[in-house]
Amino acid sequence: MANILRKIIENDKGEIKKLEKTAKKVESYADAMAALSDEELQAKTEEFKQRYQNGESLDQLLPEAFAVVREGAKRVLGLFPYRVQIMGGIVLHHGDVAEMRTGEGKTLTATMPVYLNAISGEGVHVITVNEYLSERDATEMGELYSWLGLSVGINLSSKSPAEKREAYNCDITYSTSSEVGFDYLRDNMVVRKENMVQRPLNFALVDEVDSVLIDEARTPLIVSGPVSSETNQLYHRADAFVKTLTEDDYAIDIPTKTIGLNDSGIDKAEEFFNLENLYDIDNVALTHYIDNALRANYIMLRDIDYVVSPEQEILIVDQFTGRTMEGRRFSDGLHQAIEAKEGVPVQEETKTSASITYQNMFRMYKKLSGMTGTGKTEEDEFREIYNMRVIPIPTNRPIQRIDHDDLLYSTLDAKFRAVVQDVKRRYEKGQPVLIGTVAVETSDLISKMLVDAGIPHEVLNAKNHEKEAHIIMNAGQRGAVTIATNMAGRGTDIKLGEGVLELGGLCVIGTERHESRRIDNQLRGRSGRQGDPGESQFYLSLEDELMRRFGSDRIKHVLERLNADDEDIVIKSRMLTRQVESAQKRVEGNNYDTRKQVLQYDDVMREQREIIYAERYDVITAERDLEPEIKAMIKRTINRTVDGHSRNDQEEALKGILNFARQALVPEDAISLEDLKEVGEVTKRSVNYDAIKVYLTELADNVYDRQIKKLRSEEAIREFQKVLILMVVDNKWTDHIDALDQLRNAVGMRGYAQNNPIVEYQSESFKMFQDMIGAIEYDVTRTMMKAQIHEQSREHVNERVSTTATGNIQAHQADANGQEIDFSKVGRNDFCPCGSGKKFKNCHGRKQF
């Protein structure tokens, strides 16, 4: 262990030497930059951009660019970065974590790498923990960037998409982590490219990086919405509709457990829901409810697939064990459809449209870096998850803060009384005190005790960031007493007031140890900034959460031996501090394992999400006709369906293929069982399924071509194709996210059966993803073939041209150009030239044949 520590320390020393060497190069430009006029210094930005375009790397530009920022900061802000700040800036440019103590000027440090990386023109995101800090830093540092010729944007949650787009198009964008994440998710839900707000993610510099990438790592960003009461009503309406159907209105394929409406069922649906065409693009969601209602009523069997509990809940029956599966629900809306069928309450659902964890969000940046005062304890996690090293930057002046050993009491009451006595003693001599708590309840309790003791004070609970920043700024004034939860006021320095140095500086009192050493170090770091004197003292009790969970019996026995009756007895020793830190390390290890497991699950979704989002982006940005892609989907759907049925009994297989063709490809009377037998050269022993695939593909191609002809322009065709694909993809993807959530909950229990839940999740989610792709292609096929396509005429705004793939317009014996049609050379199995979509023998050739 000692060897490992020695190696880490030596590595850090070696890294510091390299940083100092580069920092000296930056400093060597100081006189040259100081000699430049304002105009000459400002012109350097354009010069750097040109040199970058001509092939110089950012690393090569670094010494001179950093020197320009230093000189600019001196002229605009009245601040001149120290060498240690230059070193911190170099670490940030290299994509690592710079650990810089509180008060060492992290905000100014960031200006150098931000400026350098903005030169590329690809955008820099400066990420803060709240919007107040985003606005503050963008305003303060924005003066410098603007003076140097760079644009600065602030991305706030209250801004409109147009304002957000403008902010993201700036050279430098200030934002919170959550807002960048939500904008990314929303960008991947739009239908048109012009509605996207972000550019490709280039370089992110994260302030308080441990808070964002470690503490928030398990928190997923979710774009969702409660399913409205109207949606729940749709389950009931769809259920009421399918219960009116007869066996002639739908076709069931028993082996594959699929079901769909035939022509008479479609007609009834259009009448029931008052629609012109069920398979219009606008009705994609409705067809989903109808499909689920059909499955619920005619495929899912009560007491076999599910049971209704005495509490009126639908419980899934495990097909292998026969046991009910508590807590599991059928995905894709099927569970709600069964609830509607059985007349039990339809449980409200929240539909997740998109989600991502901070871990995977920030790993998408080309380069990621961060600043914090406390990152070394999480070095392994930064390296393993984000491929970032943690480099401790030396302080500009030696730290003079005195960190006292912990004080341990037997009860919470005794501990808090001791805290109040200590605060009172320091208040009376004028020394400012900052009391750190881990919970709002503790803050309120101590506040009440201080009121009773007659000690005026301020309370911060991390609710109003702007107000609290002003309070925390004054926490170093003579006689100030401030209570703060650990995160309250973070990002704002506490500067000492007049006469406070002589009183010992700011005293930080911790009312209990946090489960993370890093959070304790953050609290300590509020005191002793830039070489100022200060003190820190932690008060503990055996009733604290950490001590109850991990406190050793040895500590308890020592207290008992000292005086079991005196609760005010106190232990103060190095042994106690070591025991507490040992407990913290165990908790940190557990938390890291949990975050790592979250990432393993999310990595599976990440791979799938990237595929879907990339395909989606390709569709949105396509300037081409998407016919090849759609026809490929149709062909794969045909091949997949025919292959699936070919494994069944011959008669069943042909009927299944016929039902599919009628439901998804062509009008019902455009194909018959005899046609399939004829094309498939059916004998008692064989069927030529490949020939059937070719035949169905030709039929589908003809229907597709007729559908597209109903659109008048290339622009209209592309718009229709894009909307069709995106609506189906988004619908299926949101269902898939829900299904993955349910799968994750389910596989967690398999660990008890000696199965690796992660491996099970990876395997099953891959199969589900393949199924989703198949479902997307099927829905695109069906909607394309069956949609009633409208286009508003530009010349006659009020005239609406409406045609349908099922040929429900009156057919005249003339083509679209008014020319008479010659039927004499049309074969019986050819499509009728009138454009109805039916075979000639079933349309204008009916009398003849």
From Swiss-Prot:
Q: Does the keyword Zinc apply?
A: yes
**PROSITE patterns (alphabetical):** SECA (PS01312), SECA_MOTOR_DEAD (PS51196)
Q: Name one GO biological process term.
A: protein import
Its subcellular locations are: Cell membrane; Cytoplasm
Q: Which GO CC annotations does the UniProt entry carry?
A: cell envelope Sec protein transport complex; cytosol; plasma membrane
**Enzyme's top EC category:** translocase
Cite the binding residues for ATP.
Answer: Q85, G103, E104, G105, K106, T107, D493
Query: One Pfam family for this entry, by name?
Result: SEC-C
Q: Which residues bind Zn(2+)?
A: C832, C834, C843, H844
The keyword ATP-binding belongs to this UniProt entry's keyword annotation = yes
Q: Which cofactor does it need?
A: Zn(2+)
Q: Catalyzes what? A: ATP + H2O + cellular proteinSide 1 = ADP + phosphate + cellular proteinSide 2
Keywords, A to Z? ATP-binding, Cell membrane, Cytoplasm, Membrane, Metal-binding, Nucleotide-binding, Protein transport, Translocase, Translocation, Transport, Zinc
The protein's Enzyme Commission number? 7.4.2.8
Q: Name one GO molecular function term.
A: protein-exporting ATPase activity
Entry's cofactor comment: May bind 1 zinc ion per subunit.
Q: Which InterPro entries match?
A: Helicase_ATP-bd, Helicase_C-like, P-loop_NTPase, SEC_C_motif, SecA, SecA_CS, SecA_DEAD, SecA_motor_DEAD
Provide the topology term for how it sits in the membrane: Peripheral membrane protein
HAMAP family, per the entry = SecA
Quaternary structure note: Monomer and homodimer. Part of the essential Sec protein translocation apparatus which comprises SecA, SecYEG and auxiliary proteins SecDF. Other proteins may also be involved.
Family, as annotated: Belongs to the SecA family.
The protein's role, per its UniProt record: Part of the Sec protein translocase complex. Interacts with the SecYEG preprotein conducting channel. Has a central role in coupling the hydrolysis of ATP to the transfer of proteins into and across the cell membrane, serving as an ATP-driven molecular motor driving the stepwise translocation of polypeptide chains across the membrane.
Q: Which NCBIfam families match?
A: PRK09200.1, secA
Q: Would you tell me the protein name for this molecule?
A: Protein translocase subunit SecA
Q: Which organism is it from?
A: Streptococcus thermophilus (strain ATCC BAA-250 / LMG 18311)
Q: What is the lineage of its organism?
A: Bacteria, Bacillati, Bacillota, Bacilli, Lactobacillales
This protein's gene is called secA
